[in-house]
Regions:
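Sec-dependent N-terminal signal peptides
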Residues: 2-12
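Low-complexity repeat regions of mature extracellularly deployed or surface/particle-associated proteins
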Residues: 15-238
């Protein structure tokens, strides 16, 4: 069974809005918005008032393209295994806010998310399976721009997290937790390729068995990088 509620709102000289509520397997969803101050959110929203959209099911392919400035993409209920997601943001002052299986009531395994950002002063807040492992997650970021803020939290094992960042005065805060396996092949792996100046990076890896892996390649000046790896006990923070 598949249920898709999709409402589109587009008026001359007004912002475009997409409200969506999806349940069921094998869904392919592609959404593209061109221009400024556009919204993608939940089916319970009304014009001018945003709620978060719901996606539930397995084997889902989701593509989001927001091309322009001051756009918003928001989801507080993203429950699905075997998801392939491509999120493309090209512009300034955009917002992306996603919770993926935040409560742990479902699962979020075998997901492959690709996030591409071109522009400045964007804000991204992503939490994946805070109370339940997102096993075999593959999360890739490609970022080109200045003054962006990225805050993301993942509870995972058998997973990889890659960031390619080119730009200045960006802020990245990452918190990784979970079981993280017993060998390098099933650990949580984080790789950062950083180029630019005056960037601030805070990384915390706190898996149960301390099998976290971290690699950083940096060509930067006047930047601050803080790394904490901890499987328990008392630690100082960044």
């Amino acid at each position: 069974m598949r249920l898709l509620l999709l409402f589109l709102s587009s008026f001359l000289l007004a912002d475009s809005e997409i409200f969506i509520d999806q349940s069921g397997a094998n869904a392919t969803i592609k959404l593209e918005q061109l221009g400024s101050s556009n919204l993608i959110g939940g089916a319970d929203a009304v014009a001018g008032s945003m709620t978060s959209f719901n996606l539930t099911g397995t084997d889902m392919t989701l593509t989001i393209n927001q091309i322009g400035s001051s756009n918003i993409f928001r989801s507080d209920a993203f429950y699905s295994d075997y998801v392939t997601g491509l999120f493309v943001f090209n512009g300034d002052s955009n917002q992306m806010d996603i919770l993926m299986n935040s409560s742990g009531a479902y699962s979020a395994d075998y997901a492959n998310y690709n996030i591409e950002v071109t522009g400045g002063s964007n804000a991204f807040d992503i939490a994946v399976a805070e109370n339940s492992n997102a096993d075999y997650l593959d999360l890739d970021w490609i970022i080109d721009g200045d003054n962006n803020e990225f805050d993301f939290e993942i509870d995972y094992e058998n997973a990889t997290n890659y960031i390619d960042l080119l730009g200045d005065s960006n802020e990245i805060t990452f918190s990784g937790s979970g079981y993280a396996g017993t060998t390098s092949s099933d650990a949580g792996y984080f790789y950062l390729d950083l180029t630019g100046s005056s960037n601030t990076v805070d990384i915390t890896q706190a898996s149960t068995l301390a099998r976290d892996w971290l690699k950083i390649e940096s060509n930067t000046s006047n930047s601050t990088i803080c790394i904490v790896q901890n499987d328990g006990g008392t630690t100082t923070s960044c």
